[in-house]
A protein has these predicted regions:
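Conserved ankyrin/ankyrin-like repeat signature
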Residues: 25-26, 58-59, 91-92, 124-125
C-alpha cells in the first residue's frame, strides 16, 4: 500500500496526479488498490480538488462515490466546488452539488463559489451556484 500513496516533491500521490491529468482508468485502478482519498498535496489539495479544477467530472464523481470529502478545504480555504467555479467547469459543478457539496461555504475573505464564478466571467456557473444556494436556504 505504501507505493500507491507515495508522494512526489509537490506532495502529489499517484491518485492526485491521475485525477489532475484526467486519467480515469488509472484513478479507478488506484482506488481498487486502496489509494488514500484524504491525502493532500503540499498546497492542501486532495485528488478531488484537482479533478474539480481541471473539469474531470467523471473522476470527481468516482472520488465522491468512494467517499472523498466534497467540502474539503485546501491551504487557501478553497473547496473543490470553488475551484470548479473559478475555472467554469459546469458539469463538474453539477457533479459536486449532486454529491452534497455546499454552495454557501466561504473562504476567509467571505468569497463563495458563485462569487468566484461571477468574478471569472462564468455566468452559467454563477447562476447554477446561486440557484443551489437558494435551494439550500429553502430546505434548511
Amino acid at each position: 500500500m505504501e507505493s500507491v500513496n507515495a508522494k512526489d516533491r509537490h506532495g502529489h500521490t499517484p491518485l492526485i496526479a491521475a485525477a489532475k491529468e484526467g486519467q480515469k482508468d488509472f484513478v479507478l485502478d488506484l482506488l481498487h488498490r486502496g489509494a488514500d482519498l484524504t491525502s493532500t498535496s503540499a498546497k492542501g489539495k486532495t485528488a478531488l480538488h484537482y479533478a474539480a479544477a481541471n473539469g474531470h467530472s467523471e473522476i470527481a464523481e468516482m472520488l465522491i462515490k468512494k467517499g472523498s470529502d466534497v467540502d474539503a478545504r485546501d491551504s487557501a480555504g478553497h473547496t473543490p466546488l470553488m475551484l470548479a467555479a473559478i475555472y467554469g467547469c459546469n458539469k463538474t459543478i453539477q457533479v459536486l452539488l449532486d454529491g452534497g457539496a455546499s454552495p454557501s461555504l466561504t473562504t476567509s475573505a467571505a468569497t463563495t463559489a458563485a462569487m468566484y464564478a461571477q468574478n471569472n466571467n462564468h455566468p452559467l456557473a454563477a447562476a447554477m451556484l446561486k440557484k443551489a444556494e437558494r435551494a439550500k436556504h429553502h430546505t434548511a
